[in-house]
Amino acid sequence: MKFNIKNGTPEKQRSACVVAGIFEQQKLTPAAEALDKSANGYITGILSRGDMKGKAGATLMLHNVPNSACERVLLVGLGKEQELGDKGYRDAVRAVFKALSDTGAADATLFLLEAPVKNRDLSWKVLQIAVGGLESMYRFDRLKSKVEEAEPKLQKITLGIIKSLTEEEQTASEEALQQGLAVGDGMSLAKDLGNLAPNICTPTYLAEQAMNMAKTYKLKVTVLEQKDMEDLGMGALLAVARGSRQPPKLIALEYWGGAKKGKPVVLVGKGVTFDTGGISLKPAGEMDEMKYDMCGAASVLGTVHAVAKMGLPINVVGIIPATENMPGGNATKPGDVVTSMSGQTIEILNTDAEGRLILCDALAYTERYEPEAVIDIATLTGACVIALGHVASGLLSNDDELARELLDASERAVDRAWRLPLFDEYQEQLKSNFADVANIGGRAAGTITAACFLARFTKKYRWAHLDIAGTAWKSGKEKGATGRPVPLLTQFLISRTTRQPGSTGETGSRKNRRKSKE
């Protein structure tokens, strides 16, 4: 789907559909006013009959609007004008694309940039429309023999704006559009990987996808095999892989777009392509969803894809420890003690606490990059779902400044995160009588003790941990990967390349971007 930004008045747009907003109490936005004036009160006449009241997310499709060059006019409710915030605006965008996908329209012109969203500027709205559009049109049907839903005919979106933009506004808007499209593409990639069946998306498959991306964007990729990990002493990662016939991989994907000797930001994504729990076997119900236990890895690949597509002037390394966690005659047993790459010994009390085992070796491996900062992303604990539900990802960090950067990015991207503590007192729960540390700390504060375990392997750099167990996928009727936290991670990296006040969502200047290879 193609996007562009264009000045003009809505009634003169030769488009299959023009979209305009309506506030509650039937107050028209400037675009709706222009359409209504051209049509001699046609729209206000319809509204006066009660067909639409401007409720947030409501839509009304009109055909043959008098004196309008377009085939259709879609009205979308924006709620109360003084209360329009992030959620209301994003809900309206999704409602628009849902309504458009149900029509035969091949193109549409959206006049939604004029809506006054609290504490957000034009660039933020442009980015949200691009991301929301791609997200709304996403389909995953590649494994079906017959496609149940016809492909949407919508191919072109124009972001219309009545007022003339300054050169600075035009540049910032175009930049935001490219960022939004890159984020949307990165989310789609992460969703595709998460939604694939686990017999397809294996550790080897993830390595192949990284190699394909490296070829496309001329990145450096390294794939460590089991023998390489043995030589490095990655006893924790290999302990998880012992029960599976699928060979484990450790994937390193390097993007060097910043200063030649600049330290990279390293993203470490948990890549358990299927998690049975191992000998500590999970219940059968909903075990199919454990194919999503590699969504941390998927988000790293999606973020690196977005960064490379934008050509950001920053150095980023993605590290993915990938394996299955299966029971078997050679599988790790509860009570086994293994030696991690760092030299620390670990008593494995529960084989279903495997994510932290593969991450601890990946985090130790990360030291060779002398990173500026490290962020690991993992579907790590059910406790995080209990604590934060499916709205916010859990954030824990050994560095306050890094945590603030990530929280700011989460607010700008509307990809929520919430910080939890890493108090030393929680380390008491990880004590073992037989090793340096146990891999679980009991039921209490499960998200925190999991991060406390990881913190033991991150002493040499600034580090943050994102627990995405509640946000990486949806269950039930809408089952599927969400693509989170690609928006948060990408915004975090964008913010590091530009001066970007948190309240306005500014996206910076094009001149700060590295030329993209696409």
UniProtKB/Swiss-Prot annotation:
**Positions of the catalytic residues:** 282, 356
Record keywords:
Aminopeptidase, Cytoplasm, Hydrolase, Manganese, Metal-binding, Protease
Give cofactor(s), names only: Mn(2+)
Write down the superkingdom of origin.
Answer: Bacteria
Q: Sorted alphabetically, which InterPro entries does this protein's record hold?
A: Leucine_aapep/pepB (IPR011356), Macro_dom-like (IPR043472), Peptidase_M17_C (IPR000819), Peptidase_M17_leu_NH2_pept (IPR023042), Peptidase_M17_N (IPR008283)
Residues that, per the record, bind Mn(2+) 2: 270, 275, 293, 354
Q: Top-down, what is the taxonomic lineage of the species of origin?
A: Bacteria, Pseudomonadati, Pseudomonadota, Betaproteobacteria, Nitrosomonadales
Q: Which EC number applies?
A: 3.4.11.1, 3.4.11.10
Q: Its encoding gene is what?
A: pepA
Record note on cofactor? Binds 2 manganese ions per subunit.
Q: What is its main location?
A: cytoplasm
Q: What protein name does the entry list? A: Probable cytosol aminopeptidase
According to its UniProt entry, the function of this protein is described as: Presumably involved in the processing and regular turnover of intracellular proteins. Catalyzes the removal of unsubstituted N-terminal amino acids from various peptides.
Q: Which PROSITE patterns match?
A: CYTOSOL_AP (PS00631)
